[in-house]
From Swiss-Prot:
<dbReference type="GO" id="GO:0005886">
    <property type="term" value="C:plasma membrane"/>
</dbReference>
<dbReference type="GO" id="GO:0015232">
    <property type="term" value="F:heme transmembrane transporter activity"/>
</dbReference>
<feature type="transmembrane region" description="Helical">
    <location>
        <begin position="122"/>
        <end position="144"/>
    </location>
</feature>
<keyword id="KW-0472">Membrane</keyword>
<feature type="transmembrane region" description="Helical">
    <location>
        <begin position="185"/>
        <end position="207"/>
    </location>
</feature>
<keyword id="KW-1133">Transmembrane helix</keyword>
<dbReference type="Pfam" id="PF03379">
    <property type="entry name" value="CcmB"/>
</dbReference>
<dbReference type="InterPro" id="IPR003544">
    <property type="entry name" value="Cyt_c_biogenesis_CcmB"/>
</dbReference>
<protein>
    <recommendedName>
        <fullName>Uncharacterized protein RP268</fullName>
    </recommendedName>
</protein>
<keyword id="KW-0812">Transmembrane</keyword>
<dbReference type="GO" id="GO:0017004">
    <property type="term" value="P:cytochrome complex assembly"/>
</dbReference>
<feature type="transmembrane region" description="Helical">
    <location>
        <begin position="157"/>
        <end position="179"/>
    </location>
</feature>
<comment type="similarity">
    <text>Belongs to the CcmB/CycW/HelB family.</text>
</comment>
<feature type="transmembrane region" description="Helical">
    <location>
        <begin position="50"/>
        <end position="69"/>
    </location>
</feature>
<feature type="transmembrane region" description="Helical">
    <location>
        <begin position="95"/>
        <end position="117"/>
    </location>
</feature>
<keyword id="KW-1003">Cell membrane</keyword>
<feature type="transmembrane region" description="Helical">
    <location>
        <begin position="21"/>
        <end position="40"/>
    </location>
</feature>
Length: 215
């Protein structure tokens, strides 16, 4: 348990200070907010602003799939970690760190959404819950994508583009939740996560375990 906590702490520092996930998500989203406010009418912003915010946040996260394991491989720390702890712990720590970073970034942008999109607190709460659920799945898929690119090493830049189609069902659910306040759809999102998460973890762990042919 102590090893896992240390791993999570290490990964959080890595993703926050080196990869700057939190800062990038906030800046990317602020750019989106400014562009949306300048280009669209107030009616369009109130109608489509939240759902476009979901897509914007996901795009900003998916872009990190190419560098998730980059520093670990380049400095040899991944090989060292594999000789000390299990690949499952490495993958779980990576997932938790990314998920925490994205959640913190989401919390930072909520006040901006509240001010610029003129939403009531209930809509903001539904937005947070639904996006938080999507971040659970997207964080695991980003780790999986990074594992694939780390394992094959060449001609894998396209892998990140396959993440978004897997998130489309949850994006649709989020749109319906925000439009109709249908909280029951959250349980469907939970079910989708429970299906994809174990598969994503198992595949990621397998790829990382065999990257140096360590058994």
């Amino acid at each position: 348990m102590n090893n896992l906590f240390v791993l999570i702490k290490r990964e959080f520092i890595l993703q926050h200070r080196i990869n700057n996930i939190i800062k990038y998500i906030v800046i990317f989203f602020l750019f989106y907010i400014i562009s949306t406010v300048l280009i669209n009418s107030e009616k369009d912003i109130n109608k489509f602003g939240l759902i476009f915010s979901v897509i914007c946040l996901l795009i900003s996260l998916i872009s990190f799939s190419t560098i998730i394991f980059k520093s670990d491989v380049e400095d040899g720390s991944l090989e060292l970690l594999l000789s000390i702890v299990s690949c499952e712990k490495i993958i779980f720590a990576k997932f938790v760190a990314i998920f925490i970073c994205t959640t913190v970034g989401l919390i930072f942008v909520l006040p901006v959404i509240y001010v610029f999109f003129d939403q009531i607190l209930l809509e903001i709460a539904l937005f947070f819950i639904s996006v938080w659920m999507i971040f659970v799945l997207s964080s695991s898929l980003v780790v999986l994508s990074g594992s694939v690119q780390c394992y094959f090493k060449k001609n894998t830049n396209f892998v990140g583009t396959f993440i978004m189609p897997l998130l489309i069902p949850n994006i649709i659910m989020t749109g319906l939740i925000l439009q109709d306040n249908n909280l029951q759809l959250i349980f469907i999102m939970i079910g989708i996560n429970l299906i994809f998460l174990p598969v994503s973890f198992c595949l990621s762990a397998y790829l990382i375990k065999n990257i140096y042919n360590i058994t």
